[in-house]
């Protein structure tokens, strides 16, 4: 289940699921929980995935992917896996960690591991969304944000896209202050 930390003077923490869902809804960020128990045990917490294993993960969550795609107009999806065994992990993270926005939604479903989206709220204040297996988030178009890994430095996520072009960032000049 996701938690939120607001970058305010109190570093406000939101941990209860109803409050997390309400806060994200107020920010127009889609948040859902999908049944992670559907994932076969041999794919759980596995970070070196073959293309066949990635396709199996997509097949497991096909109903959910098709549902959100029909509601939001998404056209394609893939699986990304990052861990300390990923070649050039630090270089990849530098790209993800640069503040940016997109002209479409950025959608991620966490299959294994953890991730953090840092998002600019409607009032201009940034907040972290710490995601865990089973969490789906959709950052709306044109919202400044970036993604990073948590301390374990590993994640497997389904990425869902509006277009078949996939992840196309528009980088910002200003950086987020934590």
Swiss-Prot record:
Keywords, alphabetical: Amino-acid biosynthesis, Dioxygenase, Iron, Metal-binding, Methionine biosynthesis, Nickel, Oxidoreductase
Chain sites annotated for binding Fe(2+): 100, 102, 106, 145
Marked site (Important to generate the dianion) residue numbers: 108
Domain of life: Bacteria
List of residues binding Ni(2+): 100, 102, 106, 145
Root EC class: oxidoreductase
Obligatory cofactor(s): Fe(2+); Ni(2+)
Assembly mode: Monomer.
Segments crossing the lipid bilayer: none
Catalytic reaction(s) noted: 1,2-dihydroxy-5-(methylsulfanyl)pent-1-en-3-one + O2 = 3-(methylsulfanyl)propanoate + CO + formate + 2 H(+); 1,2-dihydroxy-5-(methylsulfanyl)pent-1-en-3-one + O2 = 4-methylsulfanyl-2-oxobutanoate + formate + 2 H(+)
Protein name per UniProt: Acireductone dioxygenase
Any one biological process term the GO annotation gives: L-methionine salvage from methylthioadenosine
Protein purpose: Catalyzes 2 different reactions between oxygen and the acireductone 1,2-dihydroxy-3-keto-5-methylthiopentene (DHK-MTPene) depending upon the metal bound in the active site. Fe-containing acireductone dioxygenase (Fe-ARD) produces formate and 2-keto-4-methylthiobutyrate (KMTB), the alpha-ketoacid precursor of methionine in the methionine recycle pathway. Ni-containing acireductone dioxygenase (Ni-ARD) produces methylthiopropionate, carbon monoxide and formate, and does not lie on the methionine recycle pathway.
Site label May play a role in transmitting local conformational changes, positions: 105
Family from the record: Belongs to the acireductone dioxygenase (ARD) family.
Cofactor remark: Binds 1 Fe(2+) cation per monomer.
Site note May play a role in metal incorporation in vivo, residues: 99
A Pfam family this chain is assigned to: ARD
EC number: 1.13.11.54, 1.13.11.53
Molecular-function annotations in GO: acireductone dioxygenase (Ni2+-requiring) activity; acireductone dioxygenase [iron(II)-requiring] activity; iron ion binding; nickel cation binding
Disulphide-bridged cysteine pairs: none
Pathway connected to this protein: Amino-acid biosynthesis; L-methionine biosynthesis via salvage pathway; L-methionine from S-methyl-5-thio-alpha-D-ribose 1-phosphate: step 5/6
């Amino acid at each position: 289940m996701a938690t939120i930390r607001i970058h305010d003077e109190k570093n406000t923490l939101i941990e209860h699921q109803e409050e997390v869902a309400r806060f994200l809804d107020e920010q127009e960020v889609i948040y859902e929980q999908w049944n992670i128990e559907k994932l076969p045990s041999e794919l759980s917490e596995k970070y070196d995935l073959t293309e066949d294993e990635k396709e199996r993960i997509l097949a497991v969550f096909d109903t959910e992917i098709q549902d959100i795609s029909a509601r939001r107009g998404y056209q394609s999806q893939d699986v990304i896996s990052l861990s300390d065994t990923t070649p050039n992990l630090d270089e990849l993270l530098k790209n993800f960690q640069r503040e940016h926005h997109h002209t479409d939604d950025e959608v991620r479903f966490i299959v294994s591991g953890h991730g953090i989206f840092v998002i600019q709220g409607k009032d201009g204040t940034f907040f972290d969304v710490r995601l865990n297996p089973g969490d789906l988030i959709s950052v709306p178009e044109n919202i400044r944000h970036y993604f990073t890994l948590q301390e374990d430095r590993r994640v497997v996520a389904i990425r869902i896209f509006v277009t078949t072009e996939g992840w196309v960032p528009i980088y910002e000049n200003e950086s987020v202050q934590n």
